């Protein structure tokens, strides 16, 4: 019994207790025990034949899963923020599938946080650190920040702000995350944080819609730099108050457990990191 416990890396007392529970459940003795010997009873011999069959099936099942786990294939369910997903990542995911045609993607585009424990979602791409410390977060763009921006058309009608308090005279496009309106905008200057309470005539829980309002000249948006990188590059949006650093908005790939880090997930993480690095300002 002690040798079996050592092989299973458990205490001998735990092994004895487990055997006793099994015998109680079966209503029979499987072993004849003494202080010096241990041998199977007739019932134990019969039970062992079936137990070996079950253990073999378990080993074969584990081997099958492990073989699959070594290949970049199968179903992969993703949750991605609205603006980043629609306007940045969708073509990248097409590329990823072209590289790995055995992958089947299921994509949920939403700014609402998916419940990775209850919903059938393998991984989520999220801004910020997960509130649940039990989750695994792999950095994709750890240094990403928010930028304050507006369209050239907006700045033709309104003077560019020179200091944070000027934002109180601008139409600021606010975003809802969960049940909270993101209306206190945080910035950094000379290693000190400063914040300003903003107001405006539009609020949405869809980041893509906030960006579209900014493009249409409806107001100023405080967006992740990744979300608006293409618009900034092409001059459709312009950064203002650039002498302030925007609030950190690190992007992570999040999953409920480290066992979810299949080769497909790790490969996707590496692929996205390489693409996101190209968007750095």
Mark where each language-model region is.
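C-terminal regulatory
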Residues: 118-120, 130-251, 278-281
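A short LG(V/I)-centered, amphipathic sequence patch enriched
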Residues: 23-40
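Central regulatory/effector-binding core of bacterial HTH transcription factors
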Residues: 73-136
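Residues within the DNA-recognition helix of helix-turn-helix
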Residues: 11, 17-21, 92
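Alpha-helical residues within the helix-turn-helix
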Residues: 6, 24, 98
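Short helix-loop hinge/linker segments at domain boundaries
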Residues: 35-38, 45, 56-79
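Short amphipathic alpha-helical coupling segments at ligand-binding clamshell hinges
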Residues: 88, 224, 260-274, 279-280
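Residues within helix-turn-helix
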Residues: 1-6, 13, 20
């Amino acid at each position: 019994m002690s040798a079996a416990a050592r092989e299973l890396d458990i205490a001998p007392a735990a092994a004895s207790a487990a055997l006793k529970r099994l015998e109680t459940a079966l209503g029979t003795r499987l072993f004849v025990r003494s202080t010096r010997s241990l041998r199977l009873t007739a019932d134990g011999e019969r039970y062992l034949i079936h137990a070996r069959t079950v253990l073999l099936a378990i080993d074969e099942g584990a081997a099958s899963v492990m073989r699959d786990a070594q290949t970049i294939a199968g179903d992969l369910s993703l949750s991605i923020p609205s603006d980043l997903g629609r306007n940045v990542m969708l073509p990248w995911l097409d590329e990823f599938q072209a590289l790995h045609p055995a992958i089947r993607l299921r994509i949920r585009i939403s700014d609402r946080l998916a419940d990775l424990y209850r919903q059938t979602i393998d991984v989520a791409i999220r801004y910020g650190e997960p509130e649940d410390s039990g989750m695994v977060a792999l950095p994709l763009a750890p240094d990403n920040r928010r930028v304050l921006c507006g369209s050239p058309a907006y700045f033709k009608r309104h003077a560019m702000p020179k200091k944070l308090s000027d934002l109180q005279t601008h139409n600021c496009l606010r975003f809802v995350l969960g049940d909270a309106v993101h209306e206190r905008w945080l910035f950094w200057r000379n290693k000190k944080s400063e914040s300003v309470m903003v107001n405006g005539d539009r609020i949405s829980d869809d980041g893509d819609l906030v960006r579209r309002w900014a493009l249409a000249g409806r107001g100023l948006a405080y967006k992740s730099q990744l979300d608006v990188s293409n618009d900034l590059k092409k001059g459709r949006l312009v950064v203002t108050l650039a002498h302030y650093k925007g609030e950190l908005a690190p992007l992570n790939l999040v999953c409920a457990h480290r066992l979810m880090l299949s080769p497909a997930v790790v490969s996707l993480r590496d692929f996205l990191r390489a693409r996101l690095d190209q968007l750095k300002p």
